[in-house]
């Protein structure tokens, strides 16, 4: 990719992958069983917005697919619904739901899970999977015997870019000015990485942040406290060059050799053991 010098002055790119993202699926529950009624199978999918970026308001469409197989070899049997907009979802307090319906002849009996693909226009996507459930009394030809206890790991691939010709990024830059220890959201923002100075002038150690109390959960929490940390890109450049100086022929001339005896603070002594 070639960037024109005058068209883009500054670019900040954030790429977040393999994190929980925007959705925390709560239904169907693990080991749930569904069977057709009137030739149609209905599987309600419910999830909560866990507060991580992107929020559900940023998602343009959802795609629901029926999948089976091991976590490292996902086999999506069919797309159950595509281009479902957020307005087509049912919302009850903080729980969003969509009922996926399909014909009983679509597939055979077996263990399945539903893939929830959320599209964020111009930025990327998130993928989540429901817990595994059973389909029984199906009329399809192909039955699946594979069984497992966990669903595939969710994935998030979101990219936001800010240029001098674009609108402000959806990530508020002021988020990076809030001290990390005072942030409470599931997506936290770290300060820009800086380069060390050429000299160390400090003579004593100082703590950057004050100490804080530690509390432990006695039961499982309903939502993750923290899903990811976002760090801004550098607003500066580092120049470097090749050292063209001809090295000396001997290591000692280059400072890469020393006499071992000069590094010893104590000398070894020989002790003669007297026979008894």
Curated annotation (Swiss-Prot):
GO terms for biological process: (1->6)-beta-D-glucan biosynthetic process; (1->6)-beta-D-glucan metabolic process; cell wall biogenesis; fungal-type cell wall organization. PANTHER family: CELL WALL SYNTHESIS PROTEIN KNH1-RELATED. The keyword Nucleotide-binding does not apply. Involved in cell wall beta(1->6) glucan synthesis. InterPro entries: Kre9/Knh1 (IPR045328), Kre9/Knh1-like_N (IPR018466), Kre9/Knh1_C (IPR008659). Keywords: Cell wall, Cell wall biogenesis/degradation, Glycoprotein, Secreted, Signal. Residues 1-21 form the signal peptide. It is found in: Secreted, Cell wall. It comes from Saccharomyces cerevisiae (strain ATCC 204508 / S288c). Belongs to the KRE9/KNH1 family. GO terms for cellular component: extracellular region; fungal-type vacuole. This is Cell wall synthesis protein KRE9. O-glycosylated. The keyword Glycoprotein applies.
